[in-house]
Amino acid sequence: MHSRTVFFVSDGTGITAETFGNAILAQFEMKPRHVRLPFVDTVDKAHQAVRQINHCGEVEGKKPIVFTTLVNMEVLKTLQDGCQGMLLDMFGTFVHPLEQELGIKSHHRVGRFSDASHSKEYSDRIAAINFSLAHDDGQSHHDLAGADVILVGVSRSGKTPTSLYLAMQCGLKTANYPLIPEDFERRQLPPALEPHRKKIFGLTIQAERLAEIRNERRPNSRYASLDNCRAEIAGAEAMMRRSSIRWLSTTTKSIEEIATTILQELRPERLVY
């Protein structure tokens, strides 16, 4: 049973409100019900949002929490005047003080990604996603020279989600390559990766956690057995040490933490823009 309903109201996609709101909610031991209300860009839609929020409060007997990134003042005022939830206006909290500090007025432009599809950054991100999908799980060795990052590790150690995050969020062309027992027997990196060693970053994981993940995919198989997981991890870590590959354990880290560590180690310039 959720302890409270949280609404994310935006005149755009609602992703900014949801991301910011979830970062704040993560500080509290609770499991709220999430409701995203995107494209609330007219007064009529704001009235609909107010009715939905207030009805939720009446049914649950608790004030909903409402995070909003509305920039249209008329739409925002409609929400402020009618909403019976706890309203947290993110843009209002930060934009006005920044206007005063910078001495300039903000655009109050709806949708911060409104022109994104025509930007070089957007095109680069799409290219990075396509590259990462084409080079997922060692599918292709073609154009590894064009990779920004190459992730290596045993199967199910977190390579694919990290690759896609680096592509989507950072615009990095990221290949990932599984390390398998045949690689451990050779005691060296796969030949296709050797020329690109400076781009390689390794991911490892605790054997118990790996066995748990693999058992969800192939229950009671040798692939998922704890002994096999231990052997593969030991082989992969030994190889990375011999090859002087930087690596980290993904066991207790989020994708965001993993990706940020990789950026710090391999592409620190991407942290400054």
Curated annotation (Swiss-Prot):
Belongs to the pyruvate, phosphate/water dikinase regulatory protein family. PSRP subfamily. The keyword Transferase applies. Keywords: Kinase, Nucleotide-binding, Serine/threonine-protein kinase, Transferase. Bifunctional serine/threonine kinase and phosphorylase involved in the regulation of the phosphoenolpyruvate synthase (PEPS) by catalyzing its phosphorylation/dephosphorylation. It catalyses: [pyruvate, water dikinase] + ADP = [pyruvate, water dikinase]-phosphate + AMP + H(+); [pyruvate, water dikinase]-phosphate + phosphate + H(+) = [pyruvate, water dikinase] + diphosphate. ADP binds at G153, V154, S155, R156, S157, G158, K159, T160. Its EC number is 2.7.11.33, 2.7.4.28. This is Putative phosphoenolpyruvate synthase regulatory protein. It comes from Verminephrobacter eiseniae (strain EF01-2). It is an enzyme of class 2 (transferase). GO terms for molecular function: ADP binding; ATP binding; phosphotransferase activity, phosphate group as acceptor; protein serine/threonine kinase activity.
